[in-house]
Amino acid sequence: MDMTGILPLAKPRGMTSHDCVAKLRRLLKTKKVGHTGTLDPDVYGVLPVCIGHATKVAQYMSDYPKAYEGEVTVGFSTTTEDRSGDTVETKTIQQPFVEAVVDQVLATFVGEIKQIPPMYSAVKVRGKRLYEYARAGITVERPERTVTIFSLERMSDIVYEEGVCRFRFNVSCSKGTYVRTLAVDIGKALGYPAHMSDLVRTKSGPFSLEECFTFTELEERLEQGEGSSLLLPIETAILDIPRVQVNKEIEEKIRHGAVLPQKWFNHPRFTVYNEEGALLAIYKAHPSKDGFVKPEKMLANDQQ
């Protein structure tokens, strides 16, 4: 069974993104499986996975904006910035926050913000991932990064118990945003240590949690011989790239990987479809021939 397409997977808690890829390779009996952005093991939610020839477009999916539903616990911080870590600092909440003040604090994070990646993260510093240093008990200086918070809103009451409080929030953000770190920074802005106590990724680019499938659902469909029915077309993943439709004459040139004049297309990068609406290729500006475009990915069926 030749399976090609995008599988919108609902990643279960307790599995790494790599675990999911390994399991899918076994289930689908193919090595051509690739995920498009790491989700922490404790996080449940949207993980778009490229199957078969769809792995060719994985690189275009890593820049997707993301959306999450999370929970911040205010009153103590942890080594990992989430609930899996050891407690680092505690500070008892003596009196309830004014909800309007909390909402005002959240509003201050909307827009471009600076973040320092957590020590327990996959960011590389001097050739090693930060979590490798962290596990060895070494703290290293981490490069600050700029990310964008498109929206951030509290979506539950603030619940108090035993000197801490927690509330749920929705956040929409650019790629590379650490929501754990955001939770810690929200606590700092309120004057308390804090950590992220729960997280669900609800959206990744055009893929939302409502349309994702669990491993159980996938296994059931495979048993019925209908596994490919869960896959979305490759073009679903690259809808944000400008689209150009070409006639039969230009289609023939594109199928042969021709370098073409950019003035025909007016885009530095674009997807190419034929008159029947079939995806042929992704083209980009030629790096050395000014005024021309060249194929970046050949995606026509007979090229696969």
UniProtKB/Swiss-Prot annotation:
Enzyme class: isomerase
Residues annotated as the enzyme's active site: 40 (nucleophile)
Keyword terms, alphabetized: Isomerase, tRNA processing
Enzymatic reactions: uridine(55) in tRNA = pseudouridine(55) in tRNA
EC number: 5.4.99.25
InterPro entries: PsdUridine_synth_cat_dom_sf, PsdUridine_synth_N, tRNA_psdUridine_synth_TruB, TruB_C
A Pfam family recorded for this sequence: TruB_C_2
UniProt record similarity statement: Belongs to the pseudouridine synthase TruB family. Type 1 subfamily.
Function: Responsible for synthesis of pseudouridine from uracil-55 in the psi GC loop of transfer RNAs.
Descriptive protein name: tRNA pseudouridine synthase B
Organism: Halalkalibacterium halodurans (strain ATCC BAA-125 / DSM 18197 / FERM 7344 / JCM 9153 / C-125) (Bacillus halodurans)
Record lineage: Bacteria, Bacillati, Bacillota, Bacilli, Bacillales
